[in-house]
Amino acid sequence: MKILYIGTVTNNEWYEEMVLTSSSQPSAAPQTFENTLLRGIKNNGFENIEWLTFPMIAAYPKSRFLYWGKEKQILDCGVQTTFIPAINLKGIKMFSQLISSRNLIKKWLEENRNEAEVCVLMYSIYGPIAKNVVNLCRKYNRKCVAFVPDLPEHMYMAKKGIGKFVSRFYVASVKKIQGKFSGYIYLTDAMHERISNTKPYIVVEGLADEEIFAPQPKDGKKSSVVMYAGAVSKTFGVDRLTEGFRKSNIDAQLHIYGSGEYVGELKAICLKDERIKYMGRVSHSEILQKEREAELLLNLRNPSDDFTKYSFPSKTMEYMASGTPVLTTRLEGIPEEYFKYCYSVNDNNVDTVKNELEKIFSLSPTERKELGERAKSFIKDNKTGEIQAGRILNFLESLF
């Protein structure tokens, strides 16, 4: 089997520089997820694969990139990817990607015309490129598989002005092609009902990079810090998390890392309550270290939000791999097996958060530590990038 992988992943150093020089910052989750996936494929000993990247860069002038050509990069997992060229201007970017991706995909399919088993694996159903993947694979009678991290209607949610109209048009265009792949890789089982309920699929809710399984602090001591890392947004319940902590009587600080629309309000709260610290956006390696040092990690999205049924919070797996205990809401998108290894609540109401924090901190440090270590072992034994990538490769083989 030969694979062409098309995704958004870039070199980490280049990615961090791009983020720092852009006024509109992308989510770090896909970068982490894809790096782990590709490293997992490599660790499975699979080598018949080539890579293309459509980087998630804000349109000029929100980023400094006006154009990029067929730039080649060595990714952190050691493989080389080629950028799909684009003119990075609103209204032109997608059209330029439509043209350039068609040429690159067609060239690869032509080069592998005589191979028996050929598959194009695409991360995210990104309209301009996905259209070419589907049409060209049909023309050459090849398999194409989509890795679906989010439903299109949840990824593009502009709420006002011309952006709202463009978002609706874009989502409608993606829905026309989303059911035309040969197979799918979903984060949750419920996603197949919204994308394609007739095609083969596999559920891979997440994967953990082997590199994040570092030991706990040598002295065994934890800092008295409750921590959240991710999008600093009301959509993800950071406002309720913050207020629940403020009302609690626990002897700890709350440290929040990331960026988002709630940052302004959060900074104002920090001035009123010295226990709460906004730490900004830092490198992923620093986040991993802080997660290992913390006393408790929080991820408290609202279970009543529709999107939580169709998404698995990638931070949940990263948190659990740290060895630090985790408090999460019981989201439909999280498989039941995970809740045996973390603290959980049924909603993210302020009083619920307050009461659960006080309950957890009434437990002995030893009891909390044991839960964190059991969670780490669960992830390490079942959910590493290598294990999950092996499942994906087996699924792709099953399509032939």
Predicted regions and their residues:
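Donor nucleotide-sugar binding/catalytic pocket of nucleotide-sugar-dependent glycosyltransferases
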Residues: 153, 167, 171-215, 277
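N-terminal subdomain of nucleotide-sugar transferases
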Residues: 1-68, 115, 243-249, 331
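Acidic donor-binding loop of glycosyltransferase active sites
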Residues: 291-309, 324
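Membrane-proximal helix-turn-helix segments that form the acceptor-binding/catalytic region
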Residues: 35-39, 106, 128-131, 135-140, ...
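Conserved donor-binding/catalytic core segment of Leloir-type glycosyltransferases
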Residues: 4-6, 217-236, 241-246, 254-255
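Nucleotide-activated donor-binding/catalytic signature segment of Leloir-type glycosyltransferases, i.e.
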Residues: 264-291, 296
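Conserved acidic donor-binding segment of nucleotide-sugar-dependent glycosyltransferases
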Residues: 341-351, 359-365
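A charged, aromatic-enriched C-terminal amphipathic alpha-helix characteristic of glycosyltransferases
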Residues: 362-397
